Every structure is written in C-alpha cells, then in structure tokens.
C-alpha cells in the first residue's frame, strides 16, 4: 500500500506505463503474426509488403526499450529469412 504522496503518484504512473507497454507489446506480436500468416498464405508480394510494415513496428518497440534490441534483430532476421525462402 502506497502511503506517501510520492508513492501513490509512482503507483499511478506505473499502472499507466504498464498499460502503454502492454499495448506496444501487443502491436509487436500482431505484426509478427501478420507476417507469418502471409508467409503461410503463400503470396510472396503480400508477405513482403506486410514484412516491410512490421519491420517499422519491431524497430519502434525496440527503440522504446519494450524489448531488447537483440531480440528485435532476431525477430527481423528470422522473418526476413522466411520471406526470402518463399522464392526458393
């Protein structure tokens, strides 16, 4: 239980930040799923278009430190490899 005014304010801020971070994390997951769905669908042009938009989302979430930059790079690398493998 937050007793001081400072602790009450920090509790309010933490709740707000947690909700915002959850929203960003959800956007990230949705973007990744969209690329995977396009890859499974087999339409290379659509997969590439979705891939480009999802890269922006992944980078922005990493810039805001919601996920580590290395995790973002790993996601981007694996999705890129999957999209490129569609041509082969």
Curated annotation (Swiss-Prot):
Record keywords: Ribonucleoprotein, Ribosomal protein, RNA-binding, rRNA-binding
Gene Ontology biological-process annotations: translation
Cellular component, GO annotation: cytosol; small ribosomal subunit
Disulfide bonds: none
Signal sequence annotation: none
Xref: Gene3D superfamilies: Ribosomal protein S20 (1.20.58.110)
InterPro entries: Ribosomal_bS20, Ribosomal_bS20_sf
Record-linked PANTHER family: 30S RIBOSOMAL PROTEIN S20 (PTHR33398), SMALL RIBOSOMAL SUBUNIT PROTEIN BS20C (PTHR33398:SF1)
Cited HAMAP family: Ribosomal_bS20
Cited function: Binds directly to 16S ribosomal RNA.
Protein name: Small ribosomal subunit protein bS20
Species of the source: Azoarcus sp. (strain BH72)
């Amino acid at each position: 239980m937050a007793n001081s005014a400072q602790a009450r304010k920090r509790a309010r801020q933490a709740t707000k930040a947690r909700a915002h971070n959850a929203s960003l994390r959800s956007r990230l997951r949705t973007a990744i799923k969209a690329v995977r769905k396009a890859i499974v669908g087999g339409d290379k042009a659509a997969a590439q278009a979705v891939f480009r938009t999802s890269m922006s989302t992944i980078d922005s979430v990493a810039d805001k430190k919601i996920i580590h930059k290395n995790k973002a790079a790993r996601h981007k690398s694996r999705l890129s490899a999957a999209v490129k493998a569609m041509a082969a």
